[in-house]
């Protein structure tokens, strides 16, 4: 396993924790979920990550190249598998959304820390304001002192 692979913790895209340590829910927890969240036992098979359709990345080619240069291509991920593992949080509503067979939201890219000193240095150089998807307008790239649409 390379250093970069160690930066990605083992996780399922649609559940909590390390899949190797997964255990079935107790009857008490299953009952609580049925009462509080309204979940019922499902006969629906678990979606394989390869079957999940993701919203395409909205990064332009120029933004993709700029981010890859800033953090280093080995720490910049846009593959569907990497994006899927970071597609939302692990709250109950987030996990319930993962059961939807439609197109899933996912980040446009995943940036990994580049070693013990890489994170701070990269943050200083990156220094950009990320905007939520619903906001429109330019992004300020402070290190270059210019606006990017």
Swiss-Prot record:
This is Protein Rv2250A. The lineage of its organism: Bacteria, Bacillati, Actinomycetota, Actinomycetes, Mycobacteriales.
């Amino acid at each position: 396993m390379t250093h970069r692979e160690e930066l990605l913790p083992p996780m399922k895209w649609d559940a909590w924790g390390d899949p190797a340590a997964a255990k079935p829910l107790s009857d008490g927890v299953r009952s609580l979920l049925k009462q509080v969240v309204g979940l019922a036992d499902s006969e629906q098979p678990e979606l394989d990550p390869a079957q999940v359709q993701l919203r395409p990345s909205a990064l332009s080619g120029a933004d993709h190249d700029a981010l890859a240069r800033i953090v280093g291509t080995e720490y910049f991920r846009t593959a569907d598998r990497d994006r899927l593992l970071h597609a939302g949080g692990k709250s109950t509503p987030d996990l319930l959304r993962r059961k939807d067979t439609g197109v899933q939201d996912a980040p446009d890219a995943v940036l990994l820390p580049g070693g013990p000193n890489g994170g701070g240095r990269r943050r200083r150089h990156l220094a950009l304001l990320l905007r939520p998807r619903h906001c429109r307008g330019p992004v300020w790239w402070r290190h270059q002192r210019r606006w990017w649409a």
